[in-house]
A protein has these predicted regions:
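Hydrophobic alpha-helical transmembrane segments of membrane proteins
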Residues: 1-95, 104-239
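Catalytic domains of carbohydrate-active enzymes that cleave complex glycans
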Residues: 100-101
Length: 239
């Protein structure tokens, strides 16, 4: 009853998305809140410890930006979100032609993109606050803090956009929830491998930092354009 009341102010795809998110809040929001608490408390605690002991552990945490690429990869909502969308909504709705029209696809995509970013932001935002507070307590350079904050925002945008966009462009799931698209599997493997490699790099040079940010932003723009052209043809059920 509460679900219907809170979603009743919305209509169309926004209503459908609101009902989906409410009915699956245990799957999504409980996980996000759990990570959010850890993400905020841990850096603040390290900042306090660093200030009291003189051991600047926060500098060791903030400095190696590469490891954060892997951390955000681990905690972000990725396939668990798109698979839930397919199993609970799209597997049934894709039978209808009106649901696969370009306008309908774009509407549902941007509504879901907002939800994806909000869920990932629910983890990243407390982390950013925790890092800023912990960093200031332990006198970490402002430049180092800002570089990490920008990277965290970029990564949050990337993981929110990439998996949802690939889902719409490729729709990789069969009715049995198995992945049938080799391109989808290869792209996910590449991202995992890249994150793993970056974790080994203790100090990311500025040129690489800027390159990563630029590539992510360009990728998002290109993926939006490709999704608009391809999704009406590819966003369908697979046998």
């Amino acid at each position: 009853m509460h679900e219907r009341k809170s979603a009743s102010k919305k209509s169309g795809y926004a209503y459908l998305d609101a009902m989906f998110m409410q009915r699956h809040r245990k799957l999504f929001f409980k996980r996000a809140v759990r990570f959010a608490i850890i993400a905020f408390v841990l850096p603040v605690a390290l900042g306090i410890f660093s200030k009291l002991t003189g051991k600047n552990l926060m500098a060791d945490l903030i400095g190696p930006i590469g490891i954060w690429i892997f951390i955000i990869y681990v905690v972000a909502f990725k396939e668990n979100y798109t698979k839930a969308l397919f199993n609970n909504i799209d597997k049934y709705m894709l039978c209808y032609k009106w649901y696969r029209r370009p306008g309908a696809i774009l509407s549902s995509y941007f509504i879901r993109l907002k939800s994806s970013f909000l869920m990932n932001g629910l983890i990243t935002l407390p982390l950013i606050f925790g890092i800023v507070i912990g960093g200031m307590l332990s006198s970490v350079r402002i430049k180092s803090i800002l570089l990490l904050v920008v990277m965290l925002v970029i990564l949050t945008l990337f993981y929110s956009v990439h998996y949802l966009t690939m889902y719409y462009m490729l729709q990789p799931y069969t009715d049995q929830s198995k992945i049938k698209s080799p391109i989808y599997s290869i792209s996910n493997t590449f991202i995992y491998a890249f994150s793993l490699v970056m974790m080994q790099i203790k100090s990311v040079p500025m040129w690489l930092y800027l390159l990563i940010c630029a590539v992510v932003l360009i990728y998002m723009l290109v993926s939006f354009s490709m999704m608009k052209r391809l999704a009406p043809k590819t966003f369908k059920r697979k046998e």
